[in-house]
Amino acid sequence: MELFTVNRYTEDLKEQKDGAQGTNNEDEILQKLLKKAAKRKRKHEAIEVVETPILEKETSDVKESESKEEQVEEPEKPLEVVQEEDVPSNEFQVLGGDDSAAKKKKVQMQLPNWLAHPTIIEGGSLQPEEEVPASEAIDQLDYLEKYTCQALKQMKIKRLFPVQKQVIPWILEAHAKPPPFRPRDICVSAPTGSGKTLAFAIPIVQLLSQRVDCKVRALVVLPVAELALQVYRVISELCSKTELEVCLLSKQHKLEDEQEKLVEQYKGKYYSKADIVVTTPGRLVDHLHATKGFCLKSLKFLVIDEADRIMDAVFQNWLYHLDSHVKETTDQLLAGTQAPLCYAELQASFGKQPHKLLFSATLSQDPEKLQDLRLFQPRLFATVLTMPVLKDATEEGADTEALTDPGQFVGRYTTPAELTEQYCVTELRLKPLTVFALVEKYKWKRFLCFTNSSDQATRLTFVLKVLFQKYSTKVSELSGNLSAKVRNERLRDFAAGKINGLICSDALARGIDVADVDVVLSYETPRHITTYIHRVGRTARAGRKGTAVTVLTEQDMTLFKKILSDANKGLGEEIHVSPDIEIQHAVEYKEALAGLRSEKVKNKNQKMAEKNRVATKALIHKKQEETATVRPLTLMEKLQIKANEIVQSSKKSSETKNSKTKADKTKYQPKETKKQIIAKQLKAIEN
């Protein structure tokens, strides 16, 4: 039976067999197990910092602790000790614990001091032009020169906006200080249509108007060609009363034509023909590498408009090329280093770095995006229309000081006070019909409709043209699918009233001033709050009233609410269209959709035909190259080959003559002249 013997731990059982308090031993075993379980639980819940002792001492301590545990008996309420035991003060908080009962305080982002405490520009509803007080007229502003006032009057500007009143005198005063005091770089965050272009154009023109020789002293960089053209026109009008020259660089013109307007060469030296250059990033890189004599060593102002977009890496890393060019041509620094700490360093660095001016309606509050520019003691100007009220302001524990802290305004996207925001809920399949019904219901005659892509703009334009066939409203497309020339023509027709509505992609949503837009429609939900701000910014510009309407589906509501919450904005007023629009316009809508499908098939076939044509042309060219080696020789090629053979034979005959004896060489043998050799060659060819 020894094969079936099972050896078990019987030490405690032996004590029970001996009859010495059998029941008490069972309680002791249970108590030991509970204590060990509680000890293991405490080790898992808290991290204790303990010095590592020597191994021998550790084993002895373990034995002593085990012997002590055997002596202590606590049979009553064994779990209460674990529950009432305090956690040591040197232990860390357990991650993942159940602290839902305690209210967690929201962590505030730590910003640099200049971002956390901006200079607030109080904005609001602008007064109509006829109600401008006499004290606010441009003639009464002592910091504006006479030629500036004359140019502004020609532009039909009677007063300055709040942004201009703050920024223009500050820049002029900063440059009035004597060396070595450098002007601080500035960032301006203001709503669209608030006059940011004149805010930097006026002080630059006034500060450069007394220049002696013509050099590039101001560089204005903008993201798109249309916006660059708009800024170029504004600066050109301001310079009309001065001798300053303005040059526009964009891919809408030939590079050679721009080079002629930019530099000229005289007696081996290059001279600049422009004082102010307005450009796009890509075109700037082209001229930095391709235009000889284009030098920026005298650069005094670097203006970056729409700074949040233009600082992205997608613009060919233009800042790197600009910095490299400046370092190669002069000892001037573009990016700069840390702020000088003494008078000698201030004096040595004075005039070696341009004054940087950044402008945007959605200026980023991320310091990393502005790090590449290395701004010199920057200052932020931010526009606030109304004092925002935080949602948690009325709850207990709310930070009341934060309500008056200027840092709360950083990153807030503001819209003009004259803007009315609305939305309309519809079905996805009825979206084009809803846009048509809204235009007809409210009799909008000047509107923009934005989509998320150029292809969507093309399709929507086709459908709306069919729906508006029987009406006086005319719509047209304005997207990246069109050339720059066609886009400019469409904008001119819209400004002249020949077109009532433009169906646009988001390429037009930034900075471009389209005259007298009454309504902006968002056909598709914008992907980000910045896109929405720039879309609605095409209306309610320069104190005029405007309306922004977003067409939504039930599925879009959640995303749109989240987008607006980022700007502390609400949904606005909901507007409706007739529920019978599908029945009323069923025939036209069906015809439009059928035409769209056929147009889509037609475009697809055209693309396939173009692709096949290109492939066939490439194949023919390849065959021509292969057969070029076996084609028969022409007469000229045969004559050339025969002439080469005669030349070779004449060389051989001359070599044989040189190998004659010395006696023969002493005899006089006149050499053949060049004419005789040519005559022989022609005679041989004739034979």
UniProtKB/Swiss-Prot annotation:
Residues the record lists as binding ATP: 190-197
Gene3D superfamilies reported in the protein's UniProt record: P-loop containing nucleotide triphosphate hydrolases
Residue stretches making up the Helicase C-terminal domain: 434-583
Motif mapping: DEAD box: 305-308
Enzyme class per UniProt: hydrolase
UniProt EC number: 3.6.4.13
Pfam families, A to Z: DEAD (PF00270), Helicase_C (PF00271)
Enzymatic reactions: ATP + H2O = ADP + phosphate + H(+)
Tissues showing expression: Expressed in the germline tissue of the ovary.
Motif Q motif per UniProt: ranges: 160-168
Biased composition (Basic and acidic residues): 9-18, 54-79, 652-675
Biological processes, Gene Ontology terms: rRNA processing
Protein origin, superkingdom: Eukaryota
Main localization (coarse): nucleus
Protein name: Probable ATP-dependent RNA helicase Dbp73D
SMART domains (UniProt xref): DEXDc, HELICc
Segments crossing the lipid bilayer: none
Domain remark from Swiss-Prot or TrEMBL: The Q motif is unique to and characteristic of the DEAD box family of RNA helicases and controls ATP binding and hydrolysis.
GO molecular function terms noted in the UniProt entry: ATP binding; ATP hydrolysis activity; RNA binding; RNA helicase activity
Residue intervals of the Helicase ATP-binding domain: 177-381
Family according to the record: Belongs to the DEAD box helicase family. DDX51/DBP6 subfamily.
